[in-house]
Amino acid sequence: MIQKNWQELIKPNKVDFITHGSRTHATVVAEPLERGFGLTLGNALRRVLLSSLRGAAVTAVQIDGVLHEFSSIPGVREDVTDIVLNIKEIAIRMEGEGPKRMVVRKEGPGVVTAGDIQTVGDVEILNPEHVICTLDEGAEIRMEFTVNTGKGYVPADRNRAEDAPIGLIPVDSLYSPVRKVSYKIENTREGQVLDYDKLTLNIETNGSVTGEDAVAYAARILQDQLSIFVNFEEPQKEAPQEQVAELAFNPALLKKVDELELSVRSANCLKTDNIVYIGDLIQKTEAEMLRTPNFGRKSLNEIKEVLASMGLHLGMEIPAWPPENIEDLAKRYEDQY
């Protein structure tokens, strides 16, 4: 009875994932949902997508010749504050755990981009075209980045280590791989009911995870968090006893002829004539058997003797043979022959 509380609620019969040909944008459409569930699920998924998925980000930077973020660098058009803001926008995918180090060194004139950064094996820059700073003629810059993994948003002051060396500038870290999430609720029809909910989620990521995977991870987080509130065991359905259908013939006919103790010559003749089961064999007449190539009286007498020991003989008529599911029936009744 209690299971009707959740079993009789309508669930989406389909969830469509539309990628728009991009790894960073996706649309997820789920319908139909009970009235009100579009808002409930949409809001919950949005909050988890933005706050709880793990990713990688720069946590600190050290620039040669710079002691603090309010400095300026000769020959560099941006001041350090602007450079730090640009560093925050570097999109990173890291397979392992941190912290890891990345280095960039470049001479002017030219633009320093995220693609100029030298990374270690399991760290990948996802937006290599992103501009970090601009160098004039004769200018040179060297920066070392600290990269770590985490979730959500961590302000710079929490990234500041007590034993940090002078010149190490902490950076605000946006670990979440999801940049934007929006959703809308519309009415949809199911049968004669016109006011079920249709949930449409629009997701933008930094490319380290697809929108489809991001939704799956968020749903798994919600599932795991909500499971603690379930204080009962799932009611068990009584498994219906399997009904074994009555056969219209002797189960022994489902036995394969290669299980009979026949001579090699007789067995090969039956195989040549495509006789697989005893049910195939006993429907043959003696005359038909003797027309089989290389099949003689000796083989015929041998088969007649084996069949007689089973209460069978050649030339029998079997209604409904062969059955459609003969292989399944043979496995089911193998203990009876």
Curated annotation (Swiss-Prot):
It catalyses: RNA(n) + a ribonucleoside 5'-triphosphate = RNA(n+1) + diphosphate. GO terms for biological process: DNA-templated transcription. Disulfide bonds: none annotated. Residues 249-337 are annotated as: Alpha C-terminal domain (alpha-CTD). The keyword Hydrolase does not apply. One of its GO terms (cellular component) is DNA-directed RNA polymerase complex. SMART domains: RPOLD. Its EC number is 2.7.7.6. Residues 1-233 are annotated as: Alpha N-terminal domain (alpha-NTD). It comes from the Bacteria. It is an enzyme of class 2 (transferase). Keywords: DNA-directed RNA polymerase, Nucleotidyltransferase, Transcription, Transferase. SUPFAM superfamilies: C-terminal domain of RNA polymerase alpha subunit (SSF47789), Insert subdomain of RNA polymerase alpha subunit (SSF56553), RBP11-like subunits of RNA polymerase (SSF55257). GO terms for molecular function: DNA binding; DNA-directed RNA polymerase activity; protein dimerization activity. Belongs to the RNA polymerase alpha chain family. The N-terminal domain is essential for RNAP assembly and basal transcription, whereas the C-terminal domain is involved in interaction with transcriptional regulators and with upstream promoter elements. DNA-dependent RNA polymerase catalyzes the transcription of DNA into RNA using the four ribonucleoside triphosphates as substrates. Homodimer. The RNAP catalytic core consists of 2 alpha, 1 beta, 1 beta' and 1 omega subunit. When a sigma factor is associated with the core the holoenzyme is formed, which can initiate transcription. This is DNA-directed RNA polymerase subunit alpha. It comes from Brucella suis (strain ATCC 23445 / NCTC 10510). The gene is rpoA.
